[in-house]
Each structure stands twice: as C-alpha cells, then as structure tokens.
Amino acid sequence: MAGEFNIRKSRQADAAAILSLYPRSFPDEDLVPLVRELLMIPDTAISLIAMNDSELAGHAVLTLCSVAGNNGGVALLGPVAVEPALQRQGVGTTLIRDGLRRMKETGVHLVCVLGDPAYYSRLGFVTESLVEPPYPLPAEWAGAWQSQYLGNSLTPDAGTLVVPSQWRDPALWGPDPAS
C-alpha cells in the first residue's frame, strides 16, 4: 500500500526510468517529449518519484506557473504516471498529496490540473472557474479543468494560466485532431 513507497525529488540518474514509465502508463499518449523537457527545468518543474524499494513506482510533476497579470503562486499538476502493476494502490494519491504539501510550503496557493474529475475530486480538486487554461478546452473536457486552493493568499487569482514554454503546445490541451 501507499505507506511502502518513499517519495522524493527525482535526480538526473532517474530520468531513464521516468521516461520509460510513461509509455507503459499511457500507451495511447506520447508524453515522453513533455516529461523530458520538464525534467530539464528543475527550478520550475518539481519532479517527484515514488520508489518501491529500488524500483520506480510512480512519477508526478508540478510546474510553477502564474496567472496573467500576477506573479507566481500557481502550479500545474501533471503529468502523473504510476507503474501499471501498482495502480490502485495509492501511489498516485501519495505522490499528489506530497506534491501539494511541497507546493504549500513554497508559497503556492493554487494548484491546477487537467484530469479525470472522478479521480482528482477525491483529492480535494474542484472545477476551476476563475483561472482559465492556456488554451481553449473542448466542451466535453470542461469539468476536467480543476484546482485546489492551498491557502497562502487572501484573494483568488482570476485570468489565464501562464505556463512555461514546455506546456505551450495546444495538442497537450485537447484531443488529438488526427483521432
């Protein structure tokens, strides 16, 4: 279960294992280029891994962002991947909770995510209405844009999420038009 996993920041030596995890976790999506780029900006993208003994069990990234007109205080969660054989054992939940704690400790007050509402709502995420994603989402994905308020600010942000260049690919924010 989740208590058996050690969560820590990833190191450069972990990159190959992290990159090999994503095709197994998301066989229908190619997230490797994004993850590779995020691993190259450790001051902006906080990369966490869950270790099961000496084996990689999961990975999560939280990217520091801002809202147009404001400075910082916002992060984008994702991608999150768990070794398929270890899914539904609390690995992803443990990674995300640890990441949220770390974000709060660094002064982040809002964490946004584009993901399954049924999963993320269990972790305290709610549909986000004040901060818009950097690209328009398909109507059927509207409920997938969510956030969790961590405190650290008296007034909520409103506006468009400003993401680093690694996230500025419209294909990351909607279904593949070729599908």
Please provide the spans of the model-predicted regions:
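Short amphipathic alpha-helix that is part of the acyltransferase structural core
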Residues: 1-34, 41-57, 145-146, 151-179
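Recognition helices and adjacent regulatory flanks at domain boundaries
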Residues: 28-29, 39, 91-94
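Conserved beta-strand in the GNAT
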Residues: 47-49, 55-66, 73-81
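Short glycine/serine/proline-enriched coil/turn segments at secondary-structure junctions
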Residues: 68-70, 137-138, 154
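Conserved acetyl-CoA-binding loop-helix of GNAT-fold acetyltransferases
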Residues: 82, 88-101, 113
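Accessory recognition modules or surfaces
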Residues: 88-89, 93, 139-150
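Conserved active-site alpha-helix within GNAT-family acetyltransferase domains
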Residues: 105-109, 115-140
